[in-house]
A protein has these predicted regions:
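Short acidic, Gly/Pro-enriched loop/turn segments at secondary-structure junctions
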Residues: 47-52, 69-73
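Boundary at the C-terminal end of the N-terminal hydrophobic targeting segment
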Residues: 18-25
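Residue-level detection of beta-strand-connecting loop/turn positions
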Residues: 29, 53-54, 146
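A composition-driven surface/loop motif
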Residues: 69-150
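Sec-dependent N-terminal signal peptides
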Residues: 4-15
Length: 150
């Protein structure tokens, strides 16, 4: 019985270690996704900001932080339109290079000139009053995945 219990505990512990964990930081309609193996040290400053992978978040702006098993693909931004709203998911490795604002289904992304690699933006969903605006001087890829904007 003790061997079975020990084996069960070991299997559960290993399955937890082998599954990917992602720290999600939600600010308004934007979710920044940081893979646990990349997040490193997260520093808090004066109880008002947190630094994660060189992205600074004002804690007063953060709606929630949670951990899940979502897979994060580096250099990816996903924009999903749903009627009069849009949500944006940002890979943690490019979060510090982007300034994002979302108002309803209107998405505006400014890409820093400091970004070293191409970022892929994937747009999907539908909206009768949606917009996507992106600015920046570095090369980017725009994927339209069943997108309907009118």
């Amino acid at each position: 019985m003790k061997k079975i219990f020990a084996l069960t505990i070991t299997i559960l512990a290993l399955s937890g270690l082998l599954s990917a964990q992602t720290l999600n930081v939600q600010v308004g309609q934007v979710t920044y996704q940081f893979p646990a193996e990349q997040a490193g040290v997260m520093t808090y400053a004066a109880g008002s900001t947190v630094h994660i992978m060189d992205k600074v978040f004002a804690l007063s702006d953060v709606n929630m932080m949670y951990v899940d098993g979502a897979e994060v693909v580096d250099n990816r931004v996903a924009v999903v339109y749903n009627g009069e709203t849009a949500s944006v998911s940002v890979a943690g490795n490019v979060a510090k290079y982007l300034t994002i604002s979302v108002t309803g289904a209107h998405v505006n992304i400014a890409q820093s000139d400091d970004v070293a690699e191409e970022i892929t933006y994937t747009l999907s969903g539908n909206s009768t009053d949606g917009e996507f605006y992106m600015s920046g001087s570095y090369k980017a890829t725009l994927e339209l995945n069943g997108l309907t904007l009118t």
